């Protein structure tokens, strides 16, 4: 496997200015520039999952989400960019077409498996791998849900800079 997201690192933009005779240093961590699909919280979650995958000797990451899941979209893209396998479990055994999101996932090499709504309800927040999932795949619930999903926000690295305040933009 090649580089991970954490090795890649986001750009820091400098918007420093002077106000009332005092220098104000304003730096912006531009995680949105990492990749058009995998950035921000997805960059942090998937970077953490990559480390867990490597430490556990897994070949890839499996997760679940709906037909328009941003999480599956980002996971498939990350697998494509960084050379690891991905699998997505999606509710809707009876769909005869794939959404544009799932078409992208397939284009980036994600193996898609359609499951019933009942199966999806059982696995969406499961901590253990669903029955039948290959043992060499690291399992993460819907949206990347896991106990450690909040850890990435503790991993903010400002390249050795001391910061007084951190402001976070949210696009939910």
Regions found by a protein language model. Name each.
Residues 1-172:
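PLP-dependent amino-acid enzyme catalytic core
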């Amino acid at each position: 496997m090649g580089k991970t997201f954490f090795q890649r690192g986001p750009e820091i933009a400098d918007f420093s200015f002077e106000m009332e005779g005092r220098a104000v240093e304003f730096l912006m961590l531009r995680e949105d520039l990492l990749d058009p699909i995998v950035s921000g919280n997805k960059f942090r979650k998937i970077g953490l999952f990559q480390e867990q995958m490597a430490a556990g000797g897994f070949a890839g990451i499996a997760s679940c989400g709906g037909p328009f899941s941003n999480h599956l979209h980002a996971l498939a893209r990350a697998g494509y960019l960084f050379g690891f396998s991905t699998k997505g479990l999606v509710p809707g055994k009876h769909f005869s077409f794939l959404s544009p999101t799932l078409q992208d996932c397939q284009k980036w090499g994600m193996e898609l498996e359609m499951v019933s709504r009942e199966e999806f309800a059982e696995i969406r927040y499961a901590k253990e791998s669903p029955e039948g999932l290959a043992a060499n795949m690291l399992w993460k619930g819907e949206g990347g849900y896991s106990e450690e999903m909040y850890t990435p926000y503790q991993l903010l690295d400002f390249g050795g800079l001391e910061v007084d305040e951190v402001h976070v933009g949210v696009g939910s």
